[in-house]
């Protein structure tokens, strides 16, 4: 008897356009002229450089160490010379620059000394977690949360189910589909490694029904220890909370994490990266990227991290046109960028070239309620929009802004052509900056009070000595 499936609220059935790329074998992208490696390609604290300008580095060598627990190292994705350490354009909705390490490839692609780990089943989960951390592995299907943090949470809590997420629901994107078709053994082995690392009772690999070839590739290798499920196509079913609801019927409470209900989820790409890290000693230095849209030869590429976006587009016959838009990610959740020299990073799953977008001007909200109907997080997007525009952060918290998964369903159905998700992202950034500033001020005050108390104590001790 098959697993009972459940429906998640809201969502959309929209054209997927995956046929542009999913049937073509992936290509290995040739070396670019420069590799640009941001120090922060993940949620958490940026890594700190351990090299200097002029140093020679090899492929797989650590060039920036993790700083703190929620952080991962950055590795050279090819051999060459460090030509700069400075601020460069990085994938960001607001066009910001961030610290990066720039490598001038020498063309030799020489590996650093890397060491595979012994049979994963013979080592303890904590050691396996550390191997995955040192490999710089983060979630490859979402915001880039450091994988070892999720794994550690798993060993500190009882994990009933590990979900390996292959539900690639965003239109145009087929990089996970190609990865599974071409390297199914990586997915299966990686899933078993992660299961061992979190000591999960059950393991499920979930795909969507428009991935029959990927399903068949996994089915040939799978045993009874892993359950393989194909789900009806619906957007955004690949969202963490939505997929948990569909597979288990459970809901992750607002402000809570999947681990709080006994579930850990990782992307298929993360599973494959774990396999390579453990069995080969290879850090995360490349990934599959879909390059699609208005291109002569759209397809999936295997790309070294740090490769400029323009270099990827060029492999697919890109020719710059007036009025076009470049999106990193898909059309629903992706970010519009103007600088094609920014690099592919650990979380880059797609480069999408589109004709002129947002041809119709934004109009006032008519409070039609369509956005409410399609919101998979059961929020009130029109209220979030109103309070985001007025920067009413207190009301945004009341309306659970941070439960928004930025899926873009609300923007898609909005008859007023309002880029709702853009407003939500901006508000989230402002709130986090405000909270960071408040923490800094509180820390400064604590230091001032402590220093004042110390000086007063020392002055009192000096007076006491004089009196004695």
PLM region descriptions:
Residues 80-82:
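Conserved hydrophobic positions within beta-strands
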Residues 1-50, 102:
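N-terminal, Lys/Arg-enriched amphipathic/low-complexity engagement segments
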Residues 109-111, 139, 162-176, 295:
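Gly-rich Lys/Arg/Thr-decorated short loops/hinges at beta-loop-alpha junctions or inter-strand turns
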Residues 181-196:
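Histidine-anchored nucleotide/phosphate-binding helix
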Residues 84, 89-145, 156, 212:
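Acidic low-complexity segments
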Residues 348-362, 372, 376-455:
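Ferredoxin-type iron-sulfur electron-transfer modules in oxidoreductases and energy-metabolism complexes
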Residues 52-65, 84:
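Short, well-structured beta-strand-loop connectors
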């Amino acid at each position: 008897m098959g697993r009972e499936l459940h429906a998640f609220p809201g969502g959309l059935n929209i054209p997927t356009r995956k046929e542009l790329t999913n049937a073509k074998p992936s290509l290995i992208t040739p070396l670019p002229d420069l590799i640009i490696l941001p120090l922060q390609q993940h949620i958490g604290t940026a890594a700190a450089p351990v090299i200097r300008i002029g140093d020679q580095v090899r492929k797989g060598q650590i060039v920036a160490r993790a700083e703190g627990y929620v952080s991962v190292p950055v590795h050279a994705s090819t051999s060459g010379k460090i030509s700069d350490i400075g601020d460069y354009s990085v994938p960001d909705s607001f066009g910001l620059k961030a610290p990066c390490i720039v490598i001038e490839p020498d063309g030799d692609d020489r590996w650093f000394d890397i060491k595979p780990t012994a049979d994963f089943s013979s080592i303890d989960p904590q050691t396996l977690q550390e191997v995955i951390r040192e490999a710089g592995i983060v979630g490859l299907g979402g915001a880039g949360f450091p994988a070892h943090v999720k794994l550690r949470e798993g060993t500190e809590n009882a994990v009933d189910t590990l979900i390996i997420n292959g539900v690639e629901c965003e239109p145009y994107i087929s990089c996970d589909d190609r990865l599974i078709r071409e390297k199914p053994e990586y997915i299966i082995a990686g899933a078993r490694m992660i299961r061992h690392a979190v000591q999960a009772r059950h393991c499920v690999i979930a795909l969507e029904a428009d991935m029959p070839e990927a399903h068949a590739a996994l089915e040939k290798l799978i045993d009874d220890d892993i359950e393989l499920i194909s789900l009806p196509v619906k957007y955004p079913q690949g969202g963490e909370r939505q997929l948990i609801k569909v597979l288990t019927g459970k809901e992750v409470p607002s402000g809570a994490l999947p681990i709080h209900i006994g579930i850990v989820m990782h992307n298929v790409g993360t599973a494959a990266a774990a396999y390579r890290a453990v069995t080969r000693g290879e850090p995360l230095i490349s990934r599959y990227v879909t390059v699609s849209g208005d291109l002569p030869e759209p397809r999936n590429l295997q790309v070294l991290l740090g490769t400029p976006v323009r270099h990827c587009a060029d492999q697919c016959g890109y020719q710059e046109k007036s009025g076009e838009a470049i999106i990193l990610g898909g059309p629903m959740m992706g970010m519009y960028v103007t600088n094609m020299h920014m690099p592919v990073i650990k979380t880059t799953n797609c480069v999408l070239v589109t004709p002129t977008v947002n041809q119709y001007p934004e109009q006032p909200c008519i409070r039609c309620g369509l956005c409410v109907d399609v919101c998979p997080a059961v929020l009130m997007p029109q209220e979030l929009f109103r309070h985001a525009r007025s920067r009413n952060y207190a009301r945004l918290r009341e309306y659970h802004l941070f439960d928004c998964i930025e899926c873009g369903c609300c923007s898609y159905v909005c008859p007023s052509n309002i880029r709702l998700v853009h407003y939500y992202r901006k508000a989230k950034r402002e709130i986090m900056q405000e909270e960071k500033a408040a923490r800094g001020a509180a820390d400064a005050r604590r230091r001032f009070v402590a220093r004042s108390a110390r000086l007063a104590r020392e002055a009192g001790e000096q007076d006491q000595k004089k009196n004695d």
